[in-house]
From Swiss-Prot:
Name of the molecule in the record: Plastin-1
Pfam families cross-referenced by the UniProt entry: CH (PF00307), EF-hand_7 (PF13499)
Phylogenetic lineage: Eukaryota, Metazoa, Chordata, Craniata, Vertebrata
Main location: cytoplasm
SUPFAM superfamilies referenced in this protein's UniProt entry, alphabetically: Calponin-homology domain, CH-domain, EF-hand
Coiled-coil regions, chain positions: none
Localisation: Cytoplasm; Cell projection, Stereocilium
Domain Calponin-homology (CH): 122-238, 266-377, 396-505, 517-626
Binding positions (Ca(2+) 1): 24, 26, 28, 30, 35
Region called Fimbrin headpiece, residue ranges: 1-114
Taxonomic superkingdom: Eukaryota
One term under GO cellular component: stereocilium
Keywords associated with the record: Actin-binding, Calcium, Cell projection, Cytoplasm, Metal-binding, Phosphoprotein, Repeat
Quaternary structure annotation from Swiss-Prot or TrEMBL: Monomer.
């Protein structure tokens, strides 16, 4: 046990980041030694004062690598790893169980080792059950499992046939899954497994990290994995419109003297915080800087609700009166309950209980606020038309696909904006490692960057990223320099990202094909051979072949790899209109995911025959075909 170093998952990392940010109130990127005890408490690892003092004396010598008496996030994570790996892990396990609302389970899966602690939050379970019950209450396909009981474990059982997960993915990101591909009646273990594959591969395609989750885990209803996946899916839906190109009224949140492109770089979380503060300023109330500590007394929420509640000014609008009578209640829980009763008048009593508000649960309070924003943003787009409207075009399908691909692999932090979030190349280095291009991390500048010269540090990273691409990855990067990545030059950035995605896809194929190098020619040859062997009439000459716009070569290939997966009555083969082609493409991509191909491409990519994305579709299907042979 002494030598075991605990690995920390991305989800845990996000929770540690949440805890760190709560204590790092001034956003300096550091916490001081005297704040360490609070930090452990926030990280679900409360330790007595003497223990913290011992740690400060002993471990600071090792962990505080730059000896500045402060700890940055990386140092904190290594400290947590150290603690969880040693004797303290015993008390850690006990303390995590005692933490309010935490249910702990021992490790039971073949992957998890003996003694691992998988805890899950009772509050999250209750919140997600209520959200799903409301979201899918009118769906006839879910009548057999809804409504679920928030106070028992029915959530974990209800996900077992895959239908609920598929439905929630479509609720968060409409049209991701073609309903015709979901198995709904007379389910068998095989058709259930297909549904779960469809859900996992579709979740991946909308940017959820599913690296450590298998269909078996979902079938067994492993709580920590189920809740982790559900939170990602729900968050995609909650954040979908908190984006300026999709909601121009957010321009109202520009600060004095701020440029629009600065506002566009903010994450949905940062935009939500700014939205709340915009309304609090109008109410004459003090700003908040987080969705945990600062909202625990519910008073900011009272003012927010009062600002966004319909005033009845418009012809078809009914006035909603926010009752402040509970505002001065001495009891925090009672005050929170009164506030939530006001939220209920807006149809927004979701995600949090009074206890979640008072405890400052950051995840659930964030969801509560996002739902308020989506229901009553109460923003008016400024009349001033002096903004650069080209900035408001939003991301292309290709950009979104690349971003979802990165996020599904678990890069950290999450990529919200393809260009600005890659401007320091840290995400690109992670992608290099995932594509087996070695990165010398001693050459990489880490966050937080100094105020003075910070951009220079980012450009140094970008220069190294381009150098790695040319020398180690052997990519074609003619005319690309570090400053192009730093400035977010779309064409040149996409050229690098495409080569990373292509390499990643081909690596998967090479692994299945005994290490043989794979190229376009080999994929096309395999596709045509497989189609011919199954007596199919379709074939392709290249990834630009116009026949691909019908999706028939894709559907026939799926049928050749997994007979009976395609229901032929769903496929239109003659006299195809544009809509027919689109329907075929939607069905093809969903069925491909259902048989186990992790496809990121969109139906439009097939209809419009986008060669890059078409290549990934056939490569993923080839991977599935080779896997079957093995």
């Amino acid at each position: 046990m002494e030598n075991n170093v605990t690995t920390i998952s991305r989800e845990e990392l996000e929770e540690l980041r949440e805890a760190f940010n709560k204590i790092d109130i001034d956003n300096s990127g550091y916490v001081s030694d005297y704040e360490l005890q609070d930090l452990f408490k926030e990280a679900s690892l409360p330790l007595p004062g003497y223990k913290v003092r011992e740690i400060i004396e002993k471990i600071f010598a090792v962990t505080d690598s730059n000896k500045d008496g402060k700890i940055n996030f990386e140092e904190f994570v290594s400290l947590i790893q150290e603690l969880k790996s040693k004797d303290v892990s015993k008390s850690y396990r006990k303390s995590i169980n005692k933490k309010l609302g935490i249910t702990a389970l021992g490790g039971t899966s073949s992957i998890s080792t003996e003694g691992t602690q998988h805890s899950y939050s009772e509050e999250e379970k209750v919140a997600f059950v209520n959200w799903i019950n409301k979201a899918l209450q009118d769906d006839p396909d879910c009548k057999h499992i809804l409504p679920m009981n928030p106070s028992d474990a029915s959530l974990f059982k209800s996900l077992a046939d895959g239908i609920l997960l598929c439905k929630m993915i479509n609720f968060s990101q409409p049209d991701t899954i073609d309903e015709r591909a979901i198995n709904k009646k007379k389910l068998t273990p095989f058709t259930i497994s297909e549904n779960l594959n469809l859900a996992l591969n579709s979740a991946s395609a909308i940017g959820c990290t599913v690296v450590n989750i298998g269909s078996q885990d979902l079938q067994e209803g492993k709580p920590h994995l189920v809740l982790g996946l559900l939170w990602q899916i729900i968050k995609v839906g909650l954040f979908a419109d908190i984006e300026i190109s999709r909601n121009e009224a957010l321009i109202a949140l520009l600060n004095e003297g701020e440029e629009l492109d600065q506002l566009m770089k903010l994450s949905p979380e940062e935009l939500l915080l700014r939205w709340v503060n915009y309304h609090l300023a109008n109410a004459g109330w003090q700003k908040i800087s987080n969705f945990s500590q600062d909202i625990r007394d519910s008073r900011a929420y009272y003012h927010l609700l009062n600002q966004i509640a319909p005033k009845g000014d418009d012809f078809d609008e009914i006035h909603v009166e926010i009752d402040f009578s509970g505002f001065n209640d001495k009891n925090d829980l009672r005050r929170a309950e009164c506030m939530l009763q006001q939220a209920d008048k807006l149809g927004c009593r979701q995600f949090v209980t009074p206890a979640d508000v008072v405890a400052g649960n950051p995840k659930l309070n964030l969801a509560f606020v996002a739902n308020l924003f989506n229901t009553y943003p109460a923003l008016h787009k400024p009349d001033n038309s002096s903004y650069d409207l080209t900035l408001l075009e939003g991301e292309s399908n290709e950009e979104r696909t690349f971003r979802n691909w990165m996020n599904s692999l678990g890069v950290s932090p999450y990529v919200n904006h393809l260009y600005s979030d890659l401007s320091d190349a840290l995400i690109i280095f992670q992608l290099y490692e995932m594509t087996r291009v070695p990165v010398d991390w001693t050459h990489v500048n880490k966050r937080p960057y100094p105020l003075l010269g910070g951009n220079m540090k980012k450009i140094e990273n970008c220069n190294y990223a381009v150098e790695l691409g040319k020398t180690k990855a052997k990519f074609s990067l003619v005319g690309i320099a570090g400053h192009d990545l730093n400035e977010g030059n779309p064409t040149l950035t996409l050229a690098l990202i495409w080569q990373l995605m292509r390499r990643y896809t081909l690596n998967v194929l090479s692994d299945l094909g005994e290490g043989e190098k794979v190229n376009d020619e080999i994929i096309i040859k395999w596709v045509n051979q497989t189609l011919a062997n199954a007596n199919k009439k379709t074939s392709i000459t290249s990834f630009k072949d116009k026949s691909i716009s019908t999706s028939l070569p894709v559907l026939d290939l799926i049928d050749a790899i997994a007979p009976k997966a395609v229901r032929q009555e769903m496929v239109k083969r003659e006299d195809l209109s544009y809509q027919d082609k689109l329907n075929n493409a939607k069905y093809a991509i969903s069925v491909a995911r259902k048989i186990g191909a992790r496809i990121y491409a969109l139906p439009d990519d097939l209809v419009e025959v986008k060669p890059k994305m078409v290549m990934t579709v056939f490569a993923c299907l080839m991977g599935r075909g080779l896997n079957k042979i093995k």
